[in-house]
Amino acid sequence: MRCPKCNYLKSSVVDSRQAEEGNTIRRRRECENCHTRFTTFERIEELPLLVVKKDGTREQFSRDKIFNGIIRSAQKRPVSSSAIEKVVNDIEQKIRSDYDSEVSSVVIGNLVMDELAELDEITYVRFASVYRSFKDVDEIEALLQQITNRVRSKKKRKADETN
């Protein structure tokens, strides 16, 4: 590994540990020439994954687009950035394990919706209003009714479990 200070090509690894939930290895290195210490990260090079959009066009998968969409939907909500990061990691892991080279934007949107439904209902509704492009208030009411029914059934299950 080339030293960032003197450009010498040989360095030794001083420390090595996992980072980012085991998806990355962080290495602390020392240049054999000038003894400068620096950090490198090693991760698996993912094969490019293409997203097939509704109009048939393809673009490279971007976890940042998912992250930014959720951030916008979660504005002024009690949802931590670490919770959002976990949701994005879970979605990306599901996509990469289930799809080799292409995935539909509809599949991604549905995965995001499923995760947000568990994370925060308001964030879910905000995301859904953009993702589903509601045409009128009736469609929003139907979504709210689905959420209400889901919350009621969760409360009923919890009550049944405690009795």
Curated annotation (Swiss-Prot):
Q: Does the keyword Lyase apply?
A: no
**Pfam families from the entry?**
ATP-cone (PF03477), Zn_ribbon_NrdR (PF22811)
**Which InterPro entries is this protein grouped with?**
ATP-cone_dom, NrdR-like_N, RNR_NrdR-like
Annotated cofactor note: Binds 1 zinc ion.
Q: Which GO biological process categories is it annotated with?
A: negative regulation of DNA-templated transcription
**Required cofactor names:** Zn(2+)
PROSITE patterns found in the cross-reference section: ATP_CONE
Offer an example of a GO molecular function term for this protein: DNA binding
Q: Where are the zinc fingers (unnamed)?
A: 3-34
Tell me the ranges covered by the ATP-cone domain, including all copies.
Answer: 49-139
Swiss-Prot/TrEMBL keywords = ATP-binding, DNA-binding, Metal-binding, Nucleotide-binding, Repressor, Transcription, Transcription regulation, Zinc, Zinc-finger
* NCBIfam families for this protein: transcriptional regulator NrdR (TIGR00244)
Protein family according to the UniProt entry: Belongs to the NrdR family.
Query: What is the role of this chain?
Result: Negatively regulates transcription of bacterial ribonucleotide reductase nrd genes and operons by binding to NrdR-boxes.
Q: Write down what this protein is called.
A: Transcriptional repressor NrdR
Which species is the source of this protein?
Streptococcus mutans serotype c (strain ATCC 700610 / UA159)
Name the gene that codes for it.
Answer: nrdR
